[in-house]
Amino acid sequence: MAKGTYEGNKTHVNVGTIGHVDHGKTTLTSAITAVSSAMFPATVQKVAYDSVAKASESQGRRDPTKILTIATSHVEYESDNRHYAHVDCPGHADYIKNMITGAAQMDGAILVVSAEDGVMPQTKEHVLLSRQVGVNYIVVFLNKCDKLDDPEMAEIVEAEVIDVLDHYGFDGSKTPIIRGSAIKAIQAIEAGKDPRTDPDCKCILDLLNALDTYIPDPVREVDKDFLMSIEDVYSIPGRGTVVTGRIERGKIEKGNEVEIVGIRPTQKTTCTGVEMFKKEVVGIAGYNVGCLLRGIERKAVERGQVLAKPGTITPHKKFEAEVYILKKEEGGRHSGFVSGYRPQMYFRTTDVTGVINLQGDAQMIMPGDNANLTIELITPIAMEEKQRFAIREGGKTVGNGVVTKILE
């Protein structure tokens, strides 16, 4: 399973591609790995378009009765200063709910916009979702610029993108916008060109530089108690069960005791191995890792549970929360709701139905309102105060909340 050890001598940053379907997110992902692998052949592998796309597709087709897995592809690459783990988020509207957990893994996002098409509905929705799930830094890649007959078109699209960023609370005027063509960069590398001097690769170097300079070094919560939300579960013959996910805080290494918390009764086990990109690591906050668990069957664990230091987090189902209900113009509900409303609550990698009850004299909560609500979930999940969650209904986000008090 392991192929060497990851030497963490560069700052580690999680990023991902967002944007409308067919604007070139997957092509750009492949282009970045192509350019980076040409510059750092010892440590970075080029990932072909088909490999990125296939990973997204294969992970996306799951039993419809289960919580839908994030249809994403994970790749890694380097700049001169940083090591990046990159997730290629799906752009299709059917998969948009997965961005709630997909984008939550990002320290920053690369918004891909086709210079031919300009801003499209999913461009806006992904920017909105990024804001909601706490992605505070976006770098824009204006793709397919080689196909423009009129260079002024790029100016128009750029202005449009800045407006969208400003509208959703990002600073459009300060956001780096890089123009280029992902496919041209791939072709240049395939033709054996030097990425540091070839004009078609310049846009990718500019993009890496923008990621390095615009997205600040992440503040990791390494010193807190270990917690990782389980994204996926695999069985490895002869080795046991592996759970994967992003470490939210603390660190984990071979031999540590852990608890599996939420959805089912809490189980205690020992982590017998930690890996990232097929290399053995000490997992620290921010890393996407796989943890091998001793004596745990594949069917005894599921996505949405958390792996944590024993005794540090407990399962709960009833809590008070401060929520903001999105206005219609923000993509939310057109009408209000009353007590008994049953939407989906998204906590980390869990989506679970909850019954909302209004507090005090409130008769109805309207779009645009801030309110303190009592929520009871149908299943207990690992929860703590100050934890953020999204409220979803009919395939769209209708509100955001933060747990203010755990009741039971």
Swiss-Prot record:
GO terms for molecular function: GTP binding; GTPase activity; translation elongation factor activity. Its main location: cytoplasm. The keyword Hydrolase applies. Its EC number is 3.6.5.3. It is found in: Cytoplasm. Keywords: Cytoplasm, Elongation factor, GTP-binding, Hydrolase, Magnesium, Metal-binding, Nucleotide-binding, Protein biosynthesis. Mg(2+) binds at T26. GTP binds at residues 19-26, 88-92, 143-146. It catalyses: GTP + H2O = GDP + phosphate + H(+). Monomer. Belongs to the TRAFAC class translation factor GTPase superfamily. Classic translation factor GTPase family. EF-Tu/EF-1A subfamily. Residues 10-219 form the tr-type G domain. GTP hydrolase that promotes the GTP-dependent binding of aminoacyl-tRNA to the A-site of ribosomes during protein biosynthesis. This is Elongation factor Tu. Gene3D superfamilies: P-loop containing nucleotide triphosphate hydrolases, Translation factors. GO terms for cellular component: cytoplasm.
